[in-house]
């Protein structure tokens, strides 16, 4: 599976207008102008030349604009709106300076001001209670009023790309049209103080008659003496857009945050900066509000779409956003994306701000798909928007990219909100028929019968299902399995299992990790018996503080009837706790995430007072995760022991010359490339006495295997084995194993 290295990034997003004129091409840093401004015969051959590129600057400077268009008039805006023939005419240099202390323009909208979504204020307000005449304040250089928002410039009118209604795989927000505040109430998110600001400039060339002669050029500038260190290794996200795309009462996606689907997608211009200010991605894209019930939070998540209808030269994002991310089917670096998400940490938005990202990172090398993550900070129209995690998005494009397959042959199903049956997220409604066939098979057959178990192996990837359950159970994720239960398959030519195909194209179901925000101590602590939660046999969609049901647990319960699967699951659980969930490994990963976002915590708390933690409560939330990591394994050992009537826990110690070779225990290579293994020459793991462990010696080039020397510490007996692959039953006091190479 893929190996993800997490690293911070900067993004800048700018709302752009689509160009429907034939032959319209993108110029770097430019957006297409409003088609209403272009006469039928006008050719957009001109361009605006900026004296400075988008970046971070430590000192203020004078920005100069020029054009090579004869008699061309440059007009510009500084608020994210598109220049028109009524915008200020450029006559002299524009001072780009540190804007510290300037009044907020967009950030000071209190909850409920916009009815459904409350703008940057929160989810307050109910439909039908919208106050009229709301205006977003405009700085010098602005020309667009909110009244113009009923026909927002930049609406996606590209008829070449179909727009099916409501194709979002996420749950809808509360209600069909309106919204409510998070956790049932209105929540103001007006910043405690003025937020840090950059400057965004949009400029275009016009004729004396008012025709637009160029694309709209966009630049973002961040000026501060400490800008290079202000956010540490974090990047910057700047969203520059016509504010009507966000706040218009009828069409704004913030004002109507519970709406979903392509009708609620708005055009943007997207720029991605690395932490040193280097611009690495800049292109036209679309944006929607992302998420389910978290849409009503003050800090909303955003989802970005790369399409040729927005940018013909850049229909995909071509950049290695996630350093070291490889495809799921091979070791190729993944540097092409159709969709990305700026996630505000979901239910953890008032906790650590990285909980789900961390938990997915911890298991990204297991037999499960995960969403790569990279923390960043975001701005909108130059104003600080908050800490976000850049994430991959699960959809047909994700699987097409990760597995080099046709996305149209991908089926993604999801069990959500305590429902007993899944819904189709990607694919066709007829894809449910194969799921029903599989579910009925498990419902009607006991896996204690070996022939039934072998048939079950044609429906599900057993290695994947084990790792998937281990990740959710260990993490104490109770927002599952009757919610956030997502699985996919490749639709084969014969419609079912194809044993002769590559493993990822064989037609079996595979589960993916999604939205684990309730885990690692958010909604329950390290003592939670999530194993019992995952084996619930009641029909209810809820079990205490969580989602589970007999329907959602059926497959796992049935598989555990098979003694071979049960033994493999127990050993695999121990393998993963000894490596991926090694307490020291997890604590280090938590520390890395904490260090990355720490520079922006105070600004985050200022931006969303009362809803996002201040530094002290944030550090407390992070410390709680560390404590979870330190104590969880002990509780899980007890739950496994009780459920499966296991003996005591003992140490298995493996010794070898790591320069000559390594030992594999079950399916885990004890090498220093494996998570949780710091010393491959002398490694110890915890397993249950009386269980059988598979061991295999692997010699490195230039070396050969000689023998295993196995010592039962309770009996004091030593046995030598010449076979490089053996099975050892653990003694009651532990077992010591040495692999000898030559």
What is each of the regions a protein language model found here?
Residues 1-9:
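Bacterial N-terminal signal peptides that target proteins for export
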Residues 245-246, 252, 257-422:
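Conserved ATP-binding subdomain of kinase catalytic cores across diverse folds
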Residues 79, 343-347, 558:
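Short strand-loop junctions, especially beta-strand C-caps/beta-turns
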Residues 11, 15, 21, 26-267, ...:
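Short, compositionally stereotyped local motifs that mark structural "simplifiers"
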Residues 60-62, 91, 198-200, 218, ...:
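Extracellular structured ligand-interaction cores
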Residues 57, 195, 262, 354-355, ...:
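Short, glycine/acidic-rich beta->alpha junctions
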Residues 118, 233-235, 244-260, 269, ...:
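Middle-to-C-terminal accessory/interaction subdomains
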Residues 101-115, 232-240, 296-310, 408, ...:
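Short, surface-exposed secondary-structure junctions/capping segments
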């Amino acid at each position: 599976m893929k190996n993800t290295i997490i690293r911070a990034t900067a993004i800048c997003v700018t709302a752009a207008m689509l160009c429907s004129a034939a032959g319209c091409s993108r110029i770097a840093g430019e957006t297409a102008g409003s088609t209403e401004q272009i006469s039928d015969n006008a050719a957009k051959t001109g361009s605006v030349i900026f004296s400075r590129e988008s970046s971070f600057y430590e000192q203020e400077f004078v920005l100069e604009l020029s054009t090579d268009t004869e008699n061309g008039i440059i007009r510009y805006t500084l608020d994210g709106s598109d220049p028109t023939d009524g915008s200020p005419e450029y006559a002299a240099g524009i001072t780009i300076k540190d804007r510290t202390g300037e009044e907020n323009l967009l950030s000071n909208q209190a909850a409920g001001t916009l009815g459904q979504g409350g703008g940057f204020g929160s989810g307050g307000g109910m439909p039908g209670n919208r106050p009229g005449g709301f205006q977003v304040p405009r700085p010098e250089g602005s020309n667009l009023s909110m009244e113009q928002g009923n026909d927002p410039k930049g609406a996606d009118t590209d008829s070449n790309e179909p727009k099916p209604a409501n194709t979002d795989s996420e749950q809808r927000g509360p209600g069909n049209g309106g919204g409510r505040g998070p956790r049932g109430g209105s929540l103001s998110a007006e910043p405690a103080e003025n937020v840090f600001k950059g400057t965004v400039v949009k400029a275009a060339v016009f004729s004396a008659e008012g025709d637009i002669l160029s694309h709209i050029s966009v630049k973002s500038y961040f000026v501060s003496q400490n800008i290079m260190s202000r956010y540490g290794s974090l990047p910057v996200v700047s969203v520059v857009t016509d504010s009507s795309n966000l706040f218009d009462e009828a069409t704004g996606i913030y004002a109507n945050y519970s709406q979903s689907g392509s009708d609620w997608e708005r055009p943007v211009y997207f720029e991605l900066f690395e932490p040193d200010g280097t611009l690495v991605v800049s292109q036209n894209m679309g944006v929607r509000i992302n998420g389910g019930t978290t849409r009503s939070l003050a800090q909303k998540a955003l989802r970005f779409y790369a399409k040729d209808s927005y940018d013909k030269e850049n229909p995909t994002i071509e950049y290695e956003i996630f350093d070291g991310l490889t495809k799921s089917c091979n070791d190729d670096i993944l540097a092409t994306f159709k969709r990305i998400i700026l996630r505000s940490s979901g239910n953890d938005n008032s906790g650590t701000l990285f909980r789900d990202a961390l938990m997915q990172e911890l298991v990204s090398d297991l037999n499960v798909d995960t969403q790569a993550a990279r923390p960043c900070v975001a701005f909108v129209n130059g104003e600080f928007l908050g800490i976000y995690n850049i994430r991959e998005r699960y959809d047909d494009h994700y699987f097409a990219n990760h597995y080099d397959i046709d996305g149209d042959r991908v089926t993604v199903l999801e069990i959500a909100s305590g429902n007993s049956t899944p819904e189709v997220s990607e694919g066709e409604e007829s894809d449910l028929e194969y799921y029903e066939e599989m579910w009925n098979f498990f419902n009607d057959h006991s896996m204690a019968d070996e022939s039934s178990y072998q048939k079950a192996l044609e429906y599900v990837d057993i290695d994947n299902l084990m790792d998937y359950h281990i990740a959710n159970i260990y993490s104490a994720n109770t927002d599952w399995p009757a919610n956030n239960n997502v699985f996919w398959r490749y639709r084969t030519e014969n419609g079912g299992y194809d044993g002769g195909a590559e493993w990822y194209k064989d037609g079996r179901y595979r589960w993916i990790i999604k939205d684990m925000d309730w885990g690692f101590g958010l909604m329950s602590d390290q003592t939670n018996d999530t194993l019992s939660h995952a084996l619930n046999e009641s029909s209810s969609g809820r079990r205490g503080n969580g989602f589970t049901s007999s329907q959602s647990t059926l497959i796992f319960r049935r598989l555990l009837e098979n003694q071979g699967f049960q033994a493999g699951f127990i050993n695999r659980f121990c393998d993963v706790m000894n490596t991926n969930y090694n307490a020291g490994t997890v604590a280090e990963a938590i520390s890395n995430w904490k260090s990355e976002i720490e520079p922006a915590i105070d600004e985050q708390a200022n931006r969303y007072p009362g809803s996002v933690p201040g530094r002290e409560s944030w550090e407390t939330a992070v410390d709680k995760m560390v404590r979870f990591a330190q104590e969880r394994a002990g509780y899980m050992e007890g739950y496994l022991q009780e459920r499966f009537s296991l003996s005591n826990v003992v140490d298995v110690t493996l010794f070898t010359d790591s320069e000559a070779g390594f030992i594999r225990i079950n399916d885990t290579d004890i090498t220093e490339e494996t998570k949780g293994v710091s010393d491959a020459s002398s490694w110890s793991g915890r397993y249950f006495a009386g269980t059988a462990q598979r061991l295999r010696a692997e010699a490195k080039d230039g070396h050969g295997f000689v023998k295993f020397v196995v010592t039962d510490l309770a009996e004091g007996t030593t046995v030598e084995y010449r076979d490089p692959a053996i099975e050892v039953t653990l003694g009651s006091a532990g077992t010591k194993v040495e692999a000898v190479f030559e």
